[in-house]
Amino acid sequence: MWETRVINLFNEVLAALSYDKYPVKNESVLRSLLQVYLIGKNHDVRVEQNNSKGRSDIIVNFTKRRVVLELKYTDKVNEEKNKLDEAEQQIIEKGYGLENLGDRELIQIACVFNGNKNKRQITMYKKVENSVIALV
């Protein structure tokens, strides 16, 4: 699956960083680190892009697809599933990535980063299905 490759790559990038110097302590730090990596790869990256219902964490535009990432942070294993559900619901309710989509494929991914010292990676993710909202 395409989204699995993306998440694995992000986890490799995050694992390569010096955690003492660049600790991921919250969602905004995670978002910034991923943004810097994606910009360094010369991708068209939008962070906190507004639509009429809210702001998506990260949007990456490619020629034939758009990838939307909704990130959640926790440092507790027992919160991961709830955070994943929250991210998925937010993507669906807010319609992230639908604006000016054109004929690109839309890939929406809900992600949970666990900052616990024994984890320090994206531990749960899910490709969001059936979130297309009719635009009138």
PLM regions and their residue ranges:
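Structural signature of nuclease core domains in nucleic-acid processing machines
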Residues: 2-136
